Amino acid sequence: MASSKLLKERIESIQDTMKITNAMYLISSSKLRKARQNYQNVLPYFTRMRDTISRVVPHLPDEPEHPFFHERDLENPKRAYIVLTADKGMAGAYNQNLLKFLREHADQNDRFYVIGQVGYRALFRKDPRLVEDFHYGATAPTLQRARDITVDAIDDFKSGKLDEIYIVYTKIQNALTSEPVMERLLPLDRAHLMPAPKGLGDPRGEVEMFPDAWTVFEQTAPIYMHGMIFGAMTESFCAEQSARMTAMDSATKSAKDMIHDLELEYNRSRQGSITQEITEIIGGAAAVQNNE
């Protein structure tokens, strides 16, 4: 059995650790609420932009096909994955699950554009598919960061450097679980952007566009993709904070259990020491009486 002094030191050490895990839980909770609020603030804008594109797409000519819809019929298309990981650890298996999902779906010739320090460090000089000069942080997603990534993605797609671009991120399924998902950014799915039919009649509706539908789509489609990336970044950041809250809550509960067990052991140790001292005192007193 460990000494009372050593047990007391262990209890104090675990109590200090528990204060840290509890503080990290509260910080992640605050960041989660703020990130969700920021996303809700801009969601109406991107929702309206999505509705606008749905009204524009039916008016686009079938020929020539807009480059954003062009499916390049290649045997080995050049694919890129924009991967959203975290800047920090201590979030359970959040980063590991995402990277495992990525490796399961990617081919040897694909390219990884990683956002987040943890994912970047995990692949740096270990996986040749990592684009090392693409380096963005994942903390506190901003519209400007999402816009910069969108511009780079569109330029690489239009120039033919890339044939397909996907976003890989962690999506919150419910209050307790989240899982990695993959969504295609480019080329866009024309059928997915078509408006839902509302009764009989032409889904194109009576809409006049100036100067033409092609130009309007050329201006609005990048904003739609910008919204896709910002939404994925925010969702991923929220999932990270949720995972960290779960991990820190579990760590705090484990610390409480350890403290409880150690306190029982500490009390038994003290009780044993006191009993031994009493026994020694009684034995000493008896010896004195016998000598007298």
Indicate residue ranges for each PLM-predicted region.
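C-terminal beta-strand-loop-alpha-helix "lid" module of Rossmann-like NAD(P)-dependent dehydrogenases
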Residues: 1-292
